[in-house]
Amino acid sequence: MNHFSNCEKKIGRADITKTEEKLSITLPDDFVSHYLQFNGGTPEKSWWDGDEDFEPVEVAGFKPFVYNSQTNNDPRSLIDGCYISMLDREVIPKNLLPFANDWGGNFFCLDLDNYSIVYFATDSFDEDLTMQENHIKLQRYLTNSFANFVNGLVAEED
């Protein structure tokens, strides 16, 4: 079990349902269960090191559904507001829901097509490519489910 600190106020299923309806999406049970326990926050074990072809990446924090005391509830710091803002600016494709970020502002996303977890490297944007080509190039598959992602995070010394 991976514990989280600096979480926002607890939320109920109705808060998540409201976001699902607003975004016209359905979230997987493991994602919902996690957020009912931890609304955002910082994982105790924060490093993803699941692939020998890539450097490990650290999760700086998970985005809350509602309430963000660190940003005075700035809508862009919440799951739905970040998603809408990134879609409006064409930063991410429609099927990726950012739920966490690393220290460089890159996103850990839930792929809404199959509920896998994808790392999206916004800091590697290539101006010579089209937006669609960038959307493909900047994605790195991490694992097949949210639960596997959270449980697969390790402490730095591991």
List where the protein language model places each region.
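Catalytic Cys-His active-site segments of thiol-dependent hydrolases/isopeptidases
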Residues: 118-124
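Compact, glycine/acidic-enriched structural inserts
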Residues: 124-148
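Short, surface-exposed beta-strand/loop micro-motifs that present aromatic residues
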Residues: 106-111
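A surface-exposed partner-binding patch
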Residues: 1-104, 154-158
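Active-site donor-binding loop signature of nucleotide-sugar glycosyltransferases
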Residues: 101, 112, 122
